[in-house]
Amino acid sequence: LKGVHIENHRIILRLNSPLANRHFQQIIRKWYPQETDYALFSETGKEDSKAVSIAIPPATFNALYIFLHAFVHFLNSGIGLRQLCDWTCLLANRHKEIDATTLLRQLQDLGLLHAAQAFGYIAVTRLGLPANRLPFPLEGTKQIGEQLLEDILSTGNFGQHDNRIKPRPKGYWAGKWYTFCRATRRCNELRQFAPYEALWYPVTLIGGTIAIQINRLKGVKDKKARTKK
C-alpha cells in the first residue's frame, strides 16, 4: 500500500526459554488462522475496488505480542519509550476487545508477568494509562518499574544512546565475542525481570552462532560437489 511501511519478519517471535517459546508458539497456532481478524485498507481510506483485505491478530494476542516484542529488545539491548507507548495505546484504545483473564494467564505461563507489571507501572504512572486497563495489579512494582524506566532513559532505542557501551569490534569473531559478553552482562543485571529468559538468552546466541557455522560448512560442501560435477 502506498505510504504504508511494512516490516516483514520470517517468524512472529521466538522466546529464549524453550518452555516459554513452546507455550508462545501454541498461542500463535490457536488464533491463526481460526480467529484472525481482517481489516480493509485503501489509498482513499474508504472501502472501494482497490481496497485490500489484510489479516490482523485479535486484540488479546496483540496485547501480548507487542509487549513481548518490546521486552525481547529490552533484554537484548534496550528500548525507548516509543515501544512502551505502542503497548499503552493498544491497551487504552482496545481494552474492550482484550480478554484480561486470558492475557494474564498467558503472561503467567510464559514467566513474564513480573516484567509486564514493570511495563504497566510506567504506562500508568508516566504515560497516563488508567490502571483498570491492565489485566494485573501494580502493588509492589514501584522498584522494578523505576529500574525499567531508568534503563529506558539511559540506553534509548536498541541501546543506541548508552554511553557506557564500547563500540563493537570490526572483526567477525571479535564482534561475536563482544555481543555475547554484552548480552551475558546485561542479562545478569536484568534477570529479576524474567529469570528464565535472561538465563537462556546467552545460550541461544551460542546456538545461533553454531547453526550459522554449520550452514556455512554445508554451503561450502555443496558448492564443491557442484563444481566437481
In which residue ranges do the predicted regions lie?
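Conserved NTP-donor binding/palm subdomain of two-metal-ion nucleotidyltransferases/polymerases, i.e.
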Residues: 1-229
